[in-house]
Structures are given as structure tokens and as C-alpha cells.
Amino acid sequence: QKQLIAWAKNRVSHGGAGIKIRLVKGANLAMEKVDAELHGWPQAPYPTKEEVDANYKRMLHEGCRPENAKFVRLGVASHNLFDLAYAQLLRTREGVENRVEFEMLEGMANHQARVVNEAAGGLLLYAPVVNRGDFHNAIAYLVRRLDENTVPENFLHDLFGMTPGDAAWEAQRQRFLRACSLRDRVSADPRRTQNRATESIKLLPPDAPFRNEPDTDWALPHNVAWIREKVAAMRAVPMAEVPAAGEAEVESALQTVANAQAAWRALGFTGRATLLRQVAAGLARHRGGLIATMVSDAGKAVGEADSEVSEAIDFANFYARGFADPAFFDGSNFEPLGTVAVVPPWNFPLAIP
């Protein structure tokens, strides 16, 4: 918010127009949780509603400061009457009524919207607009908003059965007061801080539970700078020159593999599991170079190559963990298969052996 305000001030100083910031909370939280879980990242929004509410009020105060409101109009989007009343009093106290407006959704609590419109002297009402044949999309939109706003902690959950002074009202009042008390203490630091350039990769212990390897968070500028450097360096590397092998070279390679079988057998399951964990750690340490190589050699996009590195690490850790699982050996007899050729497909050169 502060960065946007500073940008808006600079824009106006150069003859441009101001901007508007809409303060809204709770929207698309389910999607944020799914996205974080799929990629192995911390959830970007605050983990608790109390923290979200506290930060909302902090942003409201920042937006209502006259020196900021002059350049940035503020939209207070909420159905929580406590928040709306708070914003109404705050904008009046700061003398910025004409720079702060209230916003609500059509179909959520229309009787409440009418009262807010009268008390605030105006209201921006949002409604989905679709062709008649696409009406189901409008219903889906409202159902999603209803789902987001009617979880037990939310104001709308209690709105229709709540009266001032009853238990539900008091619970909402206490939530509001706790958020106010945390306004200046809630963290403003980003929750996603992954840094591929400085991360430390450690070998997992044998008893570590299996967890999917996190993908690279490309929303973080330092990660983008990291991979740009890796890809640029790879462009200066000439493609490998591979001599054509003849029958003698093939026989030599096969003999080398055959000679190594005794050492591989001597490792046992514990040794092989350790080796696989070392492979996983090595892949993680060389993620940038592997991505750049796949981009250069196989024409993969950076995002796809990054996910493939994560998948390769997962394979190594998963099978290493499997050696410690009693079910892996249940009723099985293991016999050496001999020499096996591993030829990965062109489109998954790393993760699929």
C-alpha cells in the first residue's frame, strides 16, 4: 500500500491522475491455500482472521491520512458493520469523506446495503453482469462470495440471527476490539521469503517424513534475478560435442556397468537409500543449472523445468524413504535384473528415467 501511495504521488507530481485502492479481505482465500499447498509454499495471506482484520484496520488508517487520500482514493469493501462504522468515523475525523467510499456486493445483504447507503451518503454496489444464457456464471460468483463470507468467524455468518447485545453480537464485538488492539503490532513482513540464491541444502536424515519439494516462487523478484543469471550463463556455453560411439565403446560401457554391479549389491538397501538422498540434495543444489540446461538443450520453459527438478527430487526422496518401509519388502524376493538401459523422453529429460 505504501509503495502504491508513493507511486501515485509521483505520478500526480508529473501531471498524471491519482489512483484508487480497494481494501477487501477474505476473497479467494481458498484459492490461495490450494496454490500454496500445491507448490509447497507458505500461505501468502495471514494465517488467522484476527491478523487479517488487524491489518485491514492499519491499511484503513494509512489510506485515510489526508496527505495520502489526496492522491489515492480508498474503497472500503466490507459487509462487516463494525468495520464500516469504524471507517465512517475515521474518514469524518480525518476530513476525507469525499476520498473514501464504501463498497458492497449485490445480493449479499441488501437491507444492510440500503442503510449504509443512507448513513454514508453513497455506496458502490457490485453485481455480476452476464448475458441471459450465462446466468449460471453469475450464480456461481455469488455462491463463491457467500461461501467466503459466511464461515463461522465472519460477520455475515451471524448477521441474520444477531441482535445488538446478544451472544453473537458480543462475539463479533470482541473480535473487532482484538483486531483494533493488534493494529499496530501485526506483522507487515512477507510470509513467502524463499531465496534460491542463498538457500542452504541439507541431506535429509533417514527417518525424515516424505514431503514434496517446494517449487521456486517466481513472485519473488530475487528468484527471477537468480534464474535470469543462470540462463544467461548457459547461453555462453557451447552445446556438447558427442563423438559417435562404435561397437567397441558400447561393449566397454556395458562391461563397466557389469563390473559395478558387485559394488552396488554391497551397498544394500541402507546404502542405496543414502545414495538416493544424496542425489536428491545434489539435484536441489544444482536446481538453477539444471533449469538452464533444460531451457537451452530441450527448449523447456523455465517454470516447467523448475517443476521437473522438484519432481526429480521427489522421486529420489520417495524411493529412499521406501527402503525404510516394511511394506516395501512384504512377501517380496529380490533378484538382480542385470544391465538396464535408461532412456528418458525428450520432453522430461530429468524427472522421468
Features from the language model and the residues they span:
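Charged, low-complexity surface patches
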Residues: L105-E106, F135, L283, A305, ...
